[in-house]
Amino acid sequence: MFCSLRNFLHVNRRFPRHVSPSSSSLSQIQSPLCFPLSSPSPSQSSFISCPFVWFTSFLCIIRYPFVTKSGTSTYSEDFDRDWIRKVVHNDLWDDPGLEKLFDLTLAPIWVPRVLVELKEDPKLAFKFFKWSMTRNGFKHSVESYCIVAHILFCARMYYDANSVLKEMVLSKADCDVFDVLWSTRNVCVPGFGVFDALFSVLIDLGMLEEAIQCFSKMKRFRVFPKTRSCNGLLHRFAKLGKTDDVKRFFKDMIGAGARPTVFTYNIMIDCMCKEGDVEAARGLFEEMKFRGLVPDTVTYNSMIDGFGKVGRLDDTVCFFEEMKDMCCEPDVITYNALINCFCKFGKLPIGLEFYREMKGNGLKPNVVSYSTLVDAFCKEGMMQQAIKFYVDMRRVGLVPNEYTYTSLIDANCKIGNLSDAFRLGNEMLQVGVEWNVVTYTALIDGLCDAERMKEAEELFGKMDTAGVIPNLASYNALIHGFVKAKNMDRALELLNELKGRGIKPDLLLYGTFIWGLCSLEKIEAAKVVMNEMKECGIKANSLIYTTLMDAYFKSGNPTEGLHLLDEMKELDIEVTVVTFCVLIDGLCKNKLVSKAVDYFNRISNDFGLQANAAIFTAMIDGLCKDNQVEAATTLFEQMVQKGLVPDRTAYTSLMDGNFKQGNVLEALALRDKMAEIGMKLDLLAYTSLVWGLSHCNQLQKARSFLEEMIGEGIHPDEVLCISVLKKHYELGCIDEAVELQSYLMKHQLLTSDNDNALPNM
């Protein structure tokens, strides 16, 4: 109502000569708390800054005496100060004069006047203010709040002043609180600390946008908040992750002349480090020192943690050494940051050194220290060490948290030790640590890996009952389990359930479906899933394209496989050595060996890749199967010259190719080379040797390798056994054939059912 009167009567304001406001009008500032103000007119000889002042000026003309008179209900501006002090001091709240004052429609206008009369005694003014609030139907105007805030602040009653300001802001006034506070500033001896208090109150209440607007107005009137208050706003923005607002306000506060403190820089550096912008953090660190501020433990901890999390381990050590050189004592947080970053990037031994140094310096490792090391040992597969630290942790009286337990549970699940995983899970519940979504997901994943899908689904169902909402990782684990079990229908049901919960599938989930469908040779369905993924704005990666390409080659459709390679290049998707291995192997198996050779020769120039052992092996195998044994041998030699170690498959392919060409000596030389380097023959290698030698009429050697094979515990299949026996019969080696047949039946490698497959003699 009062702000409306001010606008209606064109109440304007001008500033005292001792205050130098900005030339721009306050009406330009838009705020949820803002009420438009008219601009000052130079032609006006007087001004009124608020409804209270306007009415009191008006009443100066009327000049009714402020006393109780029969037949009158109007009061003049001349209060009997002693009377009002006496009424308030003695709690004479039923005084007729006071009753009539609050019976008036203009009571909210008169109350500020009474407060001004009582300003010499701030406690009485505050007492009257609080009593007024108890009156039924009465509500203080913004002017009342502002006047009493000024009075209390001048009296250094800061706690009460802050309470009043907070209550005023929460009352959701329909006009700009700052403007009214400014217009009433001369009620007491001018002081601008109350504006900083308003700024702080807005921050404390989480009204950050309003705080920014308040700061802007303070800048216009050259009334600047304290650095401590600015730090409060920076800290709030940083906690909310509003990095852009942090940067913007830091620049504004410096521009307004605020002098940043160590705490200011600590907030900024920590914020930049959490965003991963470590170079910006370094710049602030150097700027801080340039201003003559000395970094403290918090500063160094932020720098060490920030650089450590992005893998800049050398920098973390440099900051750590500088910290000690500056006589800034590292604390447990410092060492925890160092242990974490070195463990995270696979340097567990160095992390352990920092752990020992921490203990050597008399610092006690906390739950975070132990949990970090337990997790690191688990990820390295060093379960005994992980359990040792877990036991030590309990021994020193520390209670493992959900992170500790979940690390151990996840590690046990990954090695298939589900009994210990569930034992730890039960222990976790017994000590009062609830399972979180990560715990459930680890156990579900473990059950799926063990193909215990029924139990996995039951545990998944218990999550909602326990008040734990499954996340994307939980669904990924269960869906992957069903896909691996080839139960695509149930996997699809879970996908729809996931979408119904508002969870968006990610690249991993789509990739799982594509892999599952491709393994079932449902390539078109996999293509549909891939198109859906693209529609959702998720770009397929190299692995997904490689999976689909492999499926096309295996289905005998090399054209589509090559089309996917072209698509990868068009979309700038990385063609990896894995992709290339699938390409070469797929072309060779589809009898497109010349095309495979062409791509192999272009691997460096066109794709920027170096062929690895797997690619060479695929090419060697393809050439051998295409009867190009000489080219395969040349490629084998090139492979060795490049420092690549041929594997068992490469040797077996080349050995098999030589046997097919009748090159028995070359084939046996390859077998001797395998023995020389300690490479044991497997089923395929032995099969190649036995089959090759028998078909080259080297029956004695074939029999020798067959017996060696059986002696090694490698059982030849019946096809090979019958093939060797038939060769004996073909060459007329009847006695040897009968003896061999008896030998094979003795080792249960032939049954009587196979007699029909052998020639009748």
Curated annotation (Swiss-Prot):
GO cellular component: mitochondrion
Gene Ontology biological-process annotations: mitochondrial mRNA processing
The keyword Repeat appears for this protein: yes
Source organism superkingdom: Eukaryota
InterPro entries according to UniProt: Pentatricopeptide_rpt, PPR-containing_protein, TPR-like_helical_dom_sf
Family as reported in the entry's similarity comment: Belongs to the PPR family. P subfamily.
Record protein name field: Putative pentatricopeptide repeat-containing protein At2g02150
Keyword annotations of the record: Repeat
PPR repeats: 141-175, 191-225, 226-260, 261-295, 296-330, 331-365, 366-400, 401-435, 436-470, 471-505, 506-540, 541-575, 576-606, 612-646, 647-681, 682-716, 717-751
PANTHER family, alphabetized: MEMBRANE-ASSOCIATED SALT-INDUCIBLE PROTEIN-LIKE, OS03G0201400 PROTEIN
GO molecular function, one term: pre-mRNA binding
Keyword Cell division appears in the UniProt entry: no
